[in-house]
Amino acid sequence: MSGLHRSSSSSKNIGNCLPSKELLDDLCSRFVLNVPEEDQQSFERILFLVEYAYWYYEDNAVENDPKLKSLSLKEFTSLLFNSCDVLRPYVTHIDDIFKDFTSYKCRVPVTGAIILDETYERCLLVKGWKGSSWSFPRGKKSKDEEDHACAIREVLEETGFDVSKLLKREEYIEFVFRQQRVRLYIVAGVTEDTVFAPLTKKEISEITWHRLDHLQPASNEVITHGVSGLKLYMVAPFLSSLKSWILKHPSPVARRPNKPLKALCVWNARTSVGGNGTATVESQNRKSELRTTTMESNSRKPELKRTTMESHSTKPELRKGTMESHNTTATVESHNTKPVVDHSQDIKPGGSFINFKFNQSVILQALESGNSA
């Protein structure tokens, strides 16, 4: 999602009060200190924990207290490092730590699913909470998580739909964008009346069935917009391989050329309040897709506050921008093709922070002092 970026509460929140030291210390204790020791071994992992704390602050504290100011992740990180005793010694390095963390996130493997309807004429796309780009539901892998398991989890979080019974591990399309591997499993035959609704907060603004022929690039030179005007930064690179897959795997449900299926919005944050809105996508929606929006930083899509603390990741994903063909490679995997080697293990967490050491004894001392107090 995932890429999709969650948006802060700034559009609705007009508070100007910074979080108190008590609140910051509570968040630090809950999300950074009270975790397994292995998750405190590098700043990459620590920053992922800080990111969880950030989204808890935005989704709960800011929502419940209109006086609190909505912050960017970098602003929150700086405040937390200055407030937390065990993080304060590293404040002078905060810019380098945050820069390396953002770069590291762009190398974490991403998986998701290309969901096709029963006729294979339409695919399901999701749009981020803020911005107008569309993508297939997907997100970053957690530590030691298998590709297919990540895809199932991310699709469930972004759409509320469980693809575990339909996903075939050998059917996927894979690209490598610069240093980031992106694998999307092809999940075909999903019925139109399937109910979709994201489980995450402030991550997805719309879920829609889009016609594949409307997603085709407007020209060979422009792959970021479809013929209908939709922004397709995260979609266009997969369309050619998807078309080839469909030719080899005809749909069991006959198409009706005289009555083509329409694009269909199945969930919209503006019209769905705890429910599921359904509406046909009108031309006016397409016009809105053409509006240029400022690209969000890759640091803004953590994703759902994971119940399992991820060391590798959490939902943005690919950098939004024109994807040039010489920067990508693609693989369509089936029974008779050779599996792609996963180089993600070559990325050693903490490697970019080799000069920094997280002092575990200081953490334990701080916890003991807190308990005795």
Swiss-Prot record:
Coiled coil: none annotated. Mg(2+) binds at E154, E158. GO terms for biological process: deadenylation-dependent decapping of nuclear-transcribed mRNA; deadenylation-independent decapping of nuclear-transcribed mRNA; mRNA catabolic process; mRNA processing; nuclear-transcribed mRNA catabolic process, nonsense-mediated decay; post-embryonic development; post-transcriptional gene silencing; primary shoot apical meristem specification. It is an enzyme of class 3 (hydrolase). Changing E154Q: Loss of mRNA decaping activity. Disruption phenotype: Lethal phenotype at the seedling cotyledon stage that are small and chlorotic, with disorganized veins, swollen root hairs, and altered epidermal cell morphology. Altered RNA decay. Residues 324-334 have a biased composition (Polar residues). One of its GO terms (cellular component) is cytoplasm. Its cofactor is Mn(2+); Mg(2+). SUPFAM superfamilies: Dcp2 domain-like, Nudix. Residues 106-234 form the Nudix hydrolase domain. Its EC number is 3.6.1.62. The keyword Manganese applies. It is found in: Cytoplasm, P-body. It comes from the Eukaryota. Inhibited by the product 7-methyl GDP. Keywords: ATP-binding, Cytoplasm, Hydrolase, Magnesium, Manganese, Metal-binding, mRNA processing, Nucleotide-binding, RNA-binding. GO terms for molecular function: 5'-(N(7)-methylguanosine 5'-triphospho)-[mRNA] hydrolase activity; ATP binding; magnesium ion binding; manganese ion binding; mRNA binding; protein homodimerization activity. Expressed in seedlings, mostly in root tips, root hairs, and the vascular system. Also present in roots, leaves, stems, and flowers. The keyword Ion transport does not apply. Catalytic component of the decapping complex necessary for the degradation of mRNAs, both in normal mRNA turnover and in nonsense-mediated mRNA decay. Removes the 7-methyl guanine cap structure from mRNA molecules, yielding a 5'-phosphorylated mRNA fragment and 7m-GDP. Essential for postembryonic development, especially during the formation of the shoot apical meristem (SAM). Belongs to the Nudix hydrolase family. DCP2 subfamily. This is mRNA-decapping enzyme subunit 2. It comes from Arabidopsis thaliana. The lineage of its organism: Eukaryota, Viridiplantae, Streptophyta, Embryophyta, Tracheophyta. The gene is DCP2.
